[in-house]
Curated annotation (Swiss-Prot):
Any single GO BP term: mRNA splicing, via spliceosome
UniProt entry keywords in alphabetical sequence: Cytoplasm, mRNA processing, mRNA splicing, Nucleus, Ribonucleoprotein, RNA-binding, Spliceosome
The protein's assembly and partners: Component of the heptameric LSM2-LSM8 complex that forms a seven-membered ring structure with a donut shape. The LSm subunits are arranged in the order lsm8, lsm2, lsm3, lsm6, lsm5, lsm7 and lsm4.
This protein's GO CC annotations: Lsm2-8 complex; nucleus; precatalytic spliceosome; telomerase holoenzyme complex; U2 snRNP; U4/U6 x U5 tri-snRNP complex; U5 snRNP; U6 snRNP
Keyword Nucleus: yes
Sequence similarity: Belongs to the snRNP Sm proteins family.
Protein function: Component of the nuclear LSM2-LSM8 complex, which is involved in spliceosome assembly. The LSM2-LSM8 complex plays a role in the biogenesis of the spliceosomal U4/U6-U5 tri-snRNP complex by accelerating prp24-mediated annealing of U4/U6 di-snRNA. The LSM2-LSM8 complex binds U6 snRNA terminating with a cyclic 2',3' phosphate group; RNA with an unmodified 3' hydroxyl or non-cyclic 3' phosphate is bound less tightly.
InterPro entries, per database record: Lsm8, LSM_dom_sf, PTHR15588, Sm, Sm_dom_euk/arc
Protein name stated in the entry: LSM2-LSM8 complex subunit lsm8
Residues annotated as domain Sm: 1-74
Pfam families the record matches: LSM (PF01423)
Length: 94
């Protein structure tokens, strides 16, 4: 699969610094710069409820992208995100 297969679909992006950003993939280029719409960041921690930060239209630089995957929206909607706790994703080390 290529990013072209993900166009106009909800994706989850994990950045090199461990952030989790979700949104509808609107565009990309050969350096994996991504354009997302209706995007938001999920912040999960051990001691607080999951926080959602709306981002709207968002550009992610390819050098900061560690992973891009499709979101199973049915499964995602069944998860009680307010009850999820977890450690932060560590930075990517090259």
């Amino acid at each position: 699969m290529s990013l072209a297969d993900f166009m106009e679909q909800r994706v989850q992006v994990i950045t090199n610094d461990g952030r989790v950003v979700l949104g509808s993939l609107k565009g990309f280029d050969h350096t994996t710069n991504l354009i997302l719409s209706d995007s938001f960041e999920r912040i999960i921690s051990m001691d607080q409820d999951m926080e959602t930060i709306p981002l709207g239209v968002y550009l992610l630089r390819g050098e900061n992208v560690a992973m891009v995957g499709l979101v199973n929206e049915e499964l995602d909607s069944e998860i009680e995100w307010t009850k999820i706790r977890g450690e932060a994703i560590p930075d990517v080390v090259h």
